[in-house]
């Protein structure tokens, strides 16, 4: 879990900004949003299948784009 120690002579805004950066880097907010509601395994598998298909199509597009330049 991210934590920030406030340095002497440091404003609240600067400390808050550092805290926000740490939470963004650790993906805390996105994980909390994902776990907010229960998802059955069928939904998780469906999302994984969709993302795998998107990833494959993107790679195929990039490969074809690269080959057309040769």
Curated annotation (Swiss-Prot):
It holds the Pfam family Ribosomal_S21. One of its GO terms (molecular function) is structural constituent of ribosome. Keywords: Ribonucleoprotein, Ribosomal protein. GO terms for biological process: translation. One of its GO terms (cellular component) is ribosome. PROSITE patterns: RIBOSOMAL_S21. The keyword Cytoplasm does not apply. Belongs to the bacterial ribosomal protein bS21 family. NCBIfam families: S21p. HAMAP family: Ribosomal_bS21 (MF_00358). This is Small ribosomal subunit protein bS21. It comes from Campylobacter fetus subsp. fetus (strain 82-40). The lineage of its organism: Bacteria, Pseudomonadati, Campylobacterota, Epsilonproteobacteria, Campylobacterales.
């Amino acid at each position: 879990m991210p934590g920030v120690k406030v340095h002497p002579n440091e404003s609240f805004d600067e400390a808050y900004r550092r805290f926000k950066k740490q939470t963004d880097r650790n993906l805390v907010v996105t994980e909390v949003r994902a776990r907010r509601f229960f998802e059955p395994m069928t939904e998780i598998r469906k999302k994984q299948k969709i993302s795998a298909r998107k990833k494959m199509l993107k790679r195929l597009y990039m490969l074809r784009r690269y080959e057309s330049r040769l």
